[in-house]
A protein has these predicted regions:
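Structural alpha/beta surface segment adjacent to cysteine/selenocysteine redox centers
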Residues: 1-70, 138
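C-terminal cap of thioredoxin/glutaredoxin-like
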Residues: 1, 63-142
Length: 142
């Protein structure tokens, strides 16, 4: 996204799907990471969850969330207190509702200038055989 620095605003919203049993708590944990360590901590935490999540339906173990927070440099007890308090659950629920209201029914879902793009797209497809974000964003910036 460095190509679009200063031109594109990149925003992420939580939309944990119910069939991923740990997704809602993982979303809360990511919000706790952001509260305690800012954007950098959010992205480190978020990216590590996705790197380590198994695709066999079990996801990322909930008991690994606090150690992961410590691993990325967050205060372990502050993170645990935030996560255990459930204070991020309303934020996650609100983001899910906003997504549903905007037509999101699954992930990934992306909006470019308010237009919903459902499903995964490559950033760039030099063959132009499929839609890609670069083409969509470049058109929106014209």
């Amino acid at each position: 996204m460095s190509t679009y620095k200063g031109k594109v605003r990149y925003v992420i919203r939580d939309f944990p799907l119910s069939f991923h049993q740990n997704a809602a708590k993982q979303a809360e944990a990511s919000e706790c990471a952001a509260e305690l360590g800012g954007n950098d901590a959010f992205w480190k935490f978020h990216d590590k969850i996705f790197e380590r999540t198994t695709s066999n339906g079990t996801g990322f173990a909930l008991d690994a969330l606090v150690p992961l927070a410590k691993e990325i440099g967050l205060n372990e007890s502050a993170f645990k207190n935030c996560l255990d308090s459930g204070k991020m659950a309303p934020r996650v629920a609100e983001q899910m509702q906003e997504g549903s209201d905007a037509g999101v029914s699954g992930t990934p879902a992306t909006f470019v200038n308010g237009k919903l793009i459902s499903g995964a797209l490559p950033f760039s497809d030099p063959t132009k055989k499929t839609a890609d974000f670069k083409t969509i964003i470049d058109a929106a910036l014209k």
